[in-house]
């Protein structure tokens, strides 16, 4: 299991938090995702054999946010 912090631009409210956390939770291999709005970050626990960082970034970007 890997823990990764991803920097995300454009999140500002609970709707943003829910959108990003839900998108990541749908990915096979993600065990948890927690958004920190103050830091513009999401902390993700995942199985690197089942999901890639690139797939997680795409899921976030598909919700309309920019991954830095």
Curated annotation (Swiss-Prot):
It is found in: Cytoplasm. PROSITE patterns: HMA_1 (PS01047), HMA_2 (PS50846). The keyword Chaperone applies. SUPFAM superfamilies: HMA, heavy metal-associated domain (SSF55008). One of its GO terms (molecular function) is copper ion binding. It holds the Pfam family HMA. GO terms for cellular component: cytoplasm. Cu cation binds at residues 13, 16. Residues 2-68 form the HMA domain. Keywords: Chaperone, Copper, Cytoplasm, Metal-binding. Its main location: cytoplasm. One of its GO terms (biological process) is copper ion transport. Chaperone that serves for the intracellular sequestration and transport of Cu(+). Delivers Cu(+) to the copper-exporting P-type ATPase A (CopA). This is Copper chaperone CopZ.
């Amino acid at each position: 299991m890997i823990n990764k912090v991803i920097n995300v631009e454009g999140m500002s409210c609970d709707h943003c938090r829910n959108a990003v956390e839900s998108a990541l939770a749908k990915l096979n291999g993600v065990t948890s995702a927690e958004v920190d709005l103050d830091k513009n970050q999401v902390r993700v626990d995942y199985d690197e054999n089942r999901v890639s960082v690139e797939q997680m970034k795409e899921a976030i970007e598909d919700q309309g946010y920019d991954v830095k």
